Amino acid sequence: MDTSPPEPKLSALYQELILDHYRRPRNKGMLEHPTHAVSLNNPLCGDEIDLQLLVQDAVIRDVRFVGRGCSISQAAASMMTQLLKETSVSQALTLAGRMSAMMQGDDAAAKDKSLGDLRALAGVAKFPVRIKCALLPWNALTDAFKSPA
């Protein structure tokens, strides 16, 4: 695990990255034959996500989502789906744990390059009311593995 610090003072770049994923979400849509699917919402703010995965041989071959809500939840879903394609289920669950740690203010997790673009969301940890927004897709992911489609 690489824990090199992100480049200093990139908050404006990170904000732009979040807005880009919100405005042009990656992997938005539904799968024809998912092996795992779950719908979750955040009753506090109204964010919603339907997450679908195609898992073969313990590897996430495809992942899609449909959702609506704030820029944080939708960008987090877009970033997550990009990161998870062709990732093992065990690695995906490890990443979910790292994301959760980052949202709890864990500096090592925030510097973990395995989180990719999701590191742009590290600043959300300073706003407790928004943490659930950033974790909604990850909670959907862990729930999806509890019950196949």
Feature annotation, model-predicted:
Residues C45, C70, C133:
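Functionally engaged cysteine thiol sites
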Residues I49, S78, K132, L136:
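Active-site phosphate/pyrophosphate-handling residues
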Residues M1-G29, T87-A149:
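C-terminal binding/interaction regions
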Residues R24-G67:
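Structured beta-strand/loop patches that form or line metal/cofactor-binding pockets in enzymes
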